[in-house]
């Protein structure tokens, strides 16, 4: 039996959370080795385990994969979450890239100065409501299907759901003007593999707290 994927990252969301989401959506069990000290990072670097000297890193199928998007693409392609043809894969990739631009604001938010964090919440809300959510609302309204591409679950759906739910933690009514996205979010959240991931006790990480921020600084600051 093939070894389970092993994820190397601090014990928090960051750029690894999307990987956790996609593995969970695909129904793949995985292990985690949490980085807690600089010494653990140096050991990975000195052992030539990190191609570009940085995490996230995922051990899977005999490989040590780095670079978040490459990891996501590999897992999605392996588990039929990356479309049935070139056109579908291109659409999925385009939607994922746009959503990751929005998600990046959430990833960096806990590392801002306290005075800047509330301003950034306003900025995130504006970008979501004006730039990103109208695009996905139009797509769902236009084709009348349950998923963004090919009428089946894809990487694009998983990353968008992750981003929507993370935004709702900060802005509970963020979808109030988007009825199709509201329905879409409920449907996706009830897919059995995703529903299990959203339940207490799963490997889904909680919102970043001061302990996580301090740990990240201690590991990665020069």
Curated annotation (Swiss-Prot):
Tissue specificity annotation: Expressed at a high level in brain, placenta, and skeletal muscle and much lower in lung and liver.
Chain positions found as N-acetylmethionine: 1
EC number(s) given by UniProt: 2.5.1.18
Pfam families: GST_C_3, GST_N
GO MF terms held by the record: glutathione transferase activity; identical protein binding; protein homodimerization activity
Catalytic activity: RX + glutathione = an S-substituted glutathione + a halide anion + H(+)
A biological-process GO annotation: xenobiotic metabolic process
Annotated ranges, domain GST C-terminal: 85-208
Binding positions for glutathione per the UniProt entry: 9, 54-55, 67-68
Superkingdom of origin: Eukaryota
SUPFAM superfamilies xrefs: GST C-terminal domain-like, Thioredoxin-like
Keyword Iron in record: no
A GO cellular component entry from the record: cytosol
Locations listed in the record: Cytoplasm
Predominant cellular place of this UniProt entry's protein: cytoplasm
InterPro entries tied to this protein: Glutathione-S-Trfase_C-like, Glutathione-S-Trfase_C_sf, Glutathione_S-Trfase, Glutathione_S-Trfase_N, GST_alpha, GST_C, GST_superfamily, Thioredoxin-like_sf
Keywords associated with the record: Acetylation, Cytoplasm, Transferase
Domain GST N-terminal span(s) in chain numbering: 3-83
Top-rank EC class of the record's enzyme: transferase
Role according to the record: Conjugation of reduced glutathione to a wide number of exogenous and endogenous hydrophobic electrophiles. This isozyme has a high catalytic efficiency with 4-hydroxyalkenals such as 4-hydroxynonenal (4-HNE).
Oligomer status and interactors: Homodimer.
Family designation: Belongs to the GST superfamily. Alpha family.
Protein name: Glutathione S-transferase A4
Organism: Homo sapiens
